[in-house]
Amino acid sequence: RINIFPDGGVARLRLFGDVQRDWANQKNDIVELSALRSGGSVLGYNDAHYGDVNALLSEGRGLTMGDGWETRRRREPGNDWIVVQLGTSGFVDEIEIDTAHFKGNFPDKCSIQAALVEKGFDVNSAENWKELLPKQRLSANAIHKFKKEIANDFGPVNAIRLNIYPDGGVSRLRIFGKVI
């Protein structure tokens, strides 16, 4: 509630903090574990040349190419990556990667690694990460859903690392799963 005395207007009101969601009633449901509204957040990335990395976890499809995560062209060997803290720990059931509006600058391939980590872990450390989704080919301006490609008997996770090869843009990343 905001009160203005005696009169006037408010152009913008921004509230900052951490999302606290009650997961108790959703133990057997498949929910989006990665969404901003569920408490998901970006922990780190190696490049974010264009756009806003947090848009990657937003609702709906991207409105423009700037409404997503895009990296600069990579001239050196390697790949680009982003690490996402899930809203809560869970068992991954389905992964969705949306390349909306990325037509000539979408990644050729992607893979996902996941881990169950403690707060304050080093996002650059490779020792925690295990392969959840092996390399998959992506296409322009499309929603890519992966279910059967996900590693079996993976166990619970609370952080994921999206790897894109070699570079490019992703509009949305969604991780669906069961809350533990």
Q: What are the language-model segments listed below?
A:
Residues 1-81, 90-91, 101-180:
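Trp- and acidic/polar-enriched beta-sheet ligand-binding modules for extracellular glycan
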